[in-house]
Amino acid sequence: MLQHHQQQAQSGGYYDHYTQSPSPGSLTNADALNTTPFSVKDILNMVNQTEAYEGSYGHIDGAATASALFAAGEYQNPHQYLNHQQHQQSELPIPQQQLHHQHLDDGATTSSSLSPLLPPPPHQLYGGYQDYGMPAHMFQHHHGHPHQSFQHSASAYNMSASQFYAGASATAYQTPATYNYNYAGSGEVYGGATPSAVGIKSEYIPTPYVTPSPTLDLNSSAEVDSLQAPTQKLCVNPLSQRLMETASNSSSLRSIYGSDEGAKKKDNSQVTSSRSELRKNSISGNSNPGSNSGSTKPRMKRKPRVLFSQAQVLELECRFRLKKYLTGAEREIIAQKLNLSATQVKIWFQNRRYKSKRGDIDCEGIAKHLKLKSEPLDSPTSLPPPIPNHVMWPPTMQQSQQQQQHHAQQQQMQHM
């Protein structure tokens, strides 16, 4: 025990000079009595330090280099560190070598929490790892002892360092388990996708817009066959197939529309020809009954107007004043007397009755119009009002005579 206290006293000054802070477990840690040159905890802490240094300053892009450096850091760095520690411990006395391992262990944990370029200790990483939102099932013991498993702490540090130090490039330091997990998750995007969706990106060919040419026959199927050929080639791609179907449908609609227009033109020509034929037929039909009847006149050919002589008109006017409506016998008598037909006499009386009715209406309108005009004309005929004497100057002879007569009448009235 005395020897043990002496070794601690000798190492106290060296430790204070080395770390400038006392170790919390330097007196109570059971590992201080361990005489083995190196412990597993020392090796793991140094591996974490080397990985933190490489993660903060190194630039690794590929997954293969990440796995290679991870293996190199796991297997080669401990041997290099062993050689370096053996060289340093050979220079130190034996009592100080035992405490030197303990101080390196404690100093690694304290300096990692203080320095900004080194990772925090594993017991701090697990809480921060859960805050970053990563799934907890990636690690078997995410609440265990800080020095229980190297792979768990290293993977937790690598996930936190990817956001703190090196961004996206530091994710290459993940363990193979997390590396495969991430690529499996990202691979599901392409693995779960249908081959048609991939074909849309790789084998997409824009559908050519078919422009109608004036020399192209819309009823021919050459255009539709040329459009159906690429659809058979890209049958795997549903999007392009739909586009090609719409193009083929539009071409078929064009052909149908063109055929409909041709049919409409033919129908219009037929209608016009039938109309002309109907006109000819109606003319011939109207002329045939006129020729068959003989007495009746054809309607299409107007007969020239018959002019009545003055003697005939005077006789008809006298008969009309006597009687406006004639019987059949009276028409025959007048027709024989005037050398006219009974039909001409009948038509003349009809026209005369119509003219008489119009004349009565016109006469009434003219009479009303004349009456309206005569009313304002009667007012100027009345005598104007007498003009006062002081207005008229000098007075005329008539005015002087009128004035004298007026004074004489007034004097007579006064004497009476």
Swiss-Prot record:
SMART domains according to UniProt: HOX (SM00389)
Domain of life from the UniProt record: Eukaryota
InterPro entries linked to this entry: HD (IPR001356), Homeobox_CS (IPR017970), Homeobox_NK-like (IPR050394), Homeodomain-like_sf (IPR009057)
Major localisation: nucleus
Gene Ontology MF annotations: DNA binding; DNA-binding transcription factor activity, RNA polymerase II-specific; RNA polymerase II cis-regulatory region sequence-specific DNA binding
Pfam families: Homeodomain (PF00046)
Biased composition (Polar residues): 1-11, 18-33
Gene3D superfamilies: Homeodomain-like
Any single GO CC term annotated in Swiss-Prot or TrEMBL for this entry: nucleus
Record SUPFAM superfamilies: Homeodomain-like
Phenotype on disruption: Absence of cardiac and midgut visceral muscle, and defects in a subset of dorsal body wall muscles.
Biased composition (Low complexity): 281-295, 397-416
Annotated compartments: Nucleus
Residue ranges for the DNA-binding region feature of this UniProt entry: 301-360
Region (Disordered): 1-33, 246-305, 391-416
Keyword RNA-binding (UniProt): no
Stretch forming the signal peptide: none
GO biological process terms, semicolon-separated: cardiac muscle cell differentiation; cardioblast differentiation; cardiocyte differentiation; cell differentiation; determination of digestive tract left/right asymmetry; embryonic anterior midgut (ectodermal) morphogenesis; embryonic heart tube development; germ cell migration
Keywords recorded for this protein, A-Z: Developmental protein, DNA-binding, Homeobox, Nucleus
Function: Required for the development of heart and visceral muscle; for the formation of somatic muscles. Has a crucial function in the early mesodermal subdivisions.
Protein name listed in UniProt: Muscle-specific homeobox protein tinman
Gene: tin
